[in-house]
Each structure stands twice: as structure tokens, then as C-alpha cells.
């Protein structure tokens, strides 16, 4: 999904644009599990005076995770603003902050990974707000699409391809839901991310499995606290 710089700036700055989200606000409890940690927390998506925010906050006896994305939504497009990661204990050393600057057309990273990347004429998403764009595209009935996601370690962005690979019945809290199965991949990469999106829950993620030869991370929905 590419835009010329002029069109891109128009999307951001024209006041006549529609500022809304097709995905309703929600709060839900998820469990994140990897080889290093298993932890449950609350993921929230909500509107603020300056746009939208999405966050995930979790903690247990040994660690705490905090992820925060600030962005705008205009004409069904997510416009990244900032992205923040805070992880404790400190020895995990993963704190990072991204700022998307549309005057200089740069994204700047501070923290464990310091770099400055060019936004060029592409829309670039962070690891949290991209999920709003994914759900919006699936809700629109798109079967395949491409999205640019920021490269947290090296800077810049990488283009990923998303393909709907099937429909499946998912069991959540004893109820049977219709789930869209979506796969994310990238050329010359062994990493694959599989999303299970429940139609009855406004295409909320029931499960996300991020698998590569090195590790597998899983995010699983435990409870919907609020929707809409």
C-alpha cells in the first residue's frame, strides 16, 4: 500500500478527513508465552483527545511488560505516532521508544536500538497498531494484502504479505466462533505468524502464533472485558 509523499501528507493534515475507527474500543485479557516467559495481562484499544492508543500491560512475580502505541486513524488508515516498550527486570534490556516524524519523514528509535530511518512515501506500522490495520482489512473482506512494519532492531521497515488461508471454528469460553485464519510471511524468511480472528468479536484476535526456527511466541485471548 504505497502513496506519493504529497498524497501521504494530505492524508495526515487535511481536516476534512474522517477521523474514526471501524474497529470498536475494547479491553481484553491475554496470555503471552515464549521460551523466556509466560505472563498474562490486559490489552486495550481506546480513543483519546489526540487520536487513539493501544497498550498491553502485564506482570507477574518475576517480570513486567508494557507496550504503548499512539496513533491516528484517518480514512480507515492507521497513522503511526509513537511506540514504547518497557520491560522489567532490567537485565532483559528491551526498553525502546520510536517517534514517527512526518515533517522530516523520519522514524527515530531510542533505547536498546538507536537508529534513524526514512518513512519515504510508505505508511509504516508498529507491532501494536498494525493489528488494527489487519483487523480492518479482514473486516473489509480482503483475502490478501501487504503491510510495512517497522524493523525494531535495524531501522526502516519490512514489507509483509498477509493471506487468508481458511475459515475455522474456534472455541472460546465454551462458545463456538467463526474464525478467519490469516498468515503473515516475508520473502526469504522462515518466520510465519498465524492469526485467528473471530468474526463475532469484531475480528478480535483469539490467538496469534509467531513461529520461527529459533523460537515460538503465542498470544492467547483469555477474557473479553469490554467491547464497543
What residue spans do the PLM features occupy?
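Acidic, serine/threonine-rich low-complexity disordered tracts
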Residues: 21-102, 142-228
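Generic secondary-structure transition motif, activating predominantly at the C-termini of alpha-helices
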Residues: 13, 132, 136-138, 153, ...
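N-terminal signal peptide c-region/cleavage motif recognized by signal peptidases
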Residues: 15-17
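Hydrophobic, well-structured mid-protein blocks that either form specific transmembrane helices
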Residues: 93-139
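Short, intrinsically disordered low-complexity segments
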Residues: 1-3, 134, 183
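Sec-dependent signal peptide recognition
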Residues: 2-11
Amino acid at each position: 500500500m504505497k502513496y506519493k509523499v504529497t498524497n501521504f501528507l494530505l492524508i495526515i493534515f487535511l481536516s476534512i478527513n474522517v477521523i474514526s475507527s471501524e474497529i470498536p474500543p475494547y479491553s481484553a485479557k491475554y496470555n503471552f508465552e515464549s521460551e523466556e516467559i509466560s505472563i498474562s495481562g490486559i490489552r486495550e484499544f481506546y480513543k483519546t483527545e489526540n487520536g487513539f492508543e493501544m497498550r498491553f500491560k502485564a506482570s507477574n512475580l518475576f517480570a513486567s511488560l508494557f507496550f504503548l502505541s499512539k496513533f491516528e486513524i484517518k480514512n480507515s488508515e492507521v497513522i503511526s505516532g509513537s511506540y514504547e516498550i518497557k520491560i522489567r527486570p532490567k537485565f532483559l534490556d528491551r526498553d525502546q521508544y520510536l517517534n514517527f516524524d512526518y515533517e522530516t519523514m523520519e522514524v527515530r528509535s531510542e533505547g536498546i536500538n538507536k537508529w534513524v530511518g526514512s518513512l519515504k512515501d510508505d505508511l509504516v506500522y508498529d507491532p501494536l497498531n498494525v493489528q488494527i490495520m489487519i483487523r480492518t482489512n479482514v473486516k473489509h473482506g480482503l483475502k490478501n494484502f501487504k503491510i510495512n512494519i517497522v524493523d525494531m532492531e535495524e531501522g526502516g521497515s519490512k514489507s509483509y504479505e498477509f493471506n487468508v488461508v481458511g475459515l475455522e471454528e474456534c472455541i472460546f469460553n465454551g462458545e463456538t466462533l467463526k474464525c478467519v485464519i490469516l498468515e503473515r510471511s516475508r520473502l526469504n524468511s522462515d518466520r510465519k505468524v498465524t492469526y485467528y480472528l473471530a468474526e463475532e468479536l469484531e475480528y478480535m484476535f483469539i490467538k496469534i502464533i509467531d513461529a520461527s526456527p529459533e523460537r515460538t511466541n503465542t498470544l492467547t485471548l483469555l477474557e473479553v472485558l469490554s467491547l464497543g
